[in-house]
């Protein structure tokens, strides 16, 4: 394996993103091990690890050659971005837009291959991939816009998706017009485009991960609050639930979704059915 350049400040700055991505991927993996019913956490872990691999392959050239190494790096970035988009959409109960994600990802990779092997042009490769990633970000924003009962984390992810799309499209266009075009990789990793790309990616990836951490923590808290007022066997109110019932009936300190869950006719009928089933099992 050959190093792209000397171990200087530029390389050390470049290693910041893979380090952050590896750490975030490990955290999401641990969360998934404790919440196996949330497969999107495993997808997030894999996405961050693929992102780390993509950044490392930008600085280290494999024995297969520079062009195949760059293609492998961009492939890692594309799969990571697609997985991240799908995981965020899944987290909020939306159907994953496989057609839109697949079209944007495949179009970006196809354009990259064209301007890498058929008509070599580094500037167009940069534009093609950034436009594809910007499109993926806007797809996520469009899906989050129609989520019902949006809370702070949903709004934060929606804003971050818009900022990410703006970062990929507007920032790239401004810098390429101001400092481009780029003819080769000589000096590219010290350019203003690459420096801003590293810093913006590190910031946005951290903010997105923190938002998803908060969302996962809120899910656990809601589950614990619901379980604190119910009996796991019968589904009825437990002692704590009965003790708090007078306060709830007076409208003071109601737990989340208490009335909708326990006072609806459907819920009452369901609990009666559960009690009858349990009694039949005891008699049998």
Language-model regions, residue ranges each:
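Active-site-proximal alpha-helical element of nucleotidyl cyclase-like catalytic domains
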Residues: 245, 282-284
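Conserved nucleotide-binding and Mg2+-coordinating catalytic segments in signaling enzymes
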Residues: 226-244, 265-278
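Hydrophobic transmembrane alpha-helical segments in integral membrane proteins
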Residues: 2-22
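Short regulatory alpha-helical coupling segments
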Residues: 224-226, 239-259
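Juxtamembrane helix-loop boundaries in multi-pass membrane proteins
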Residues: 40-48, 195-198
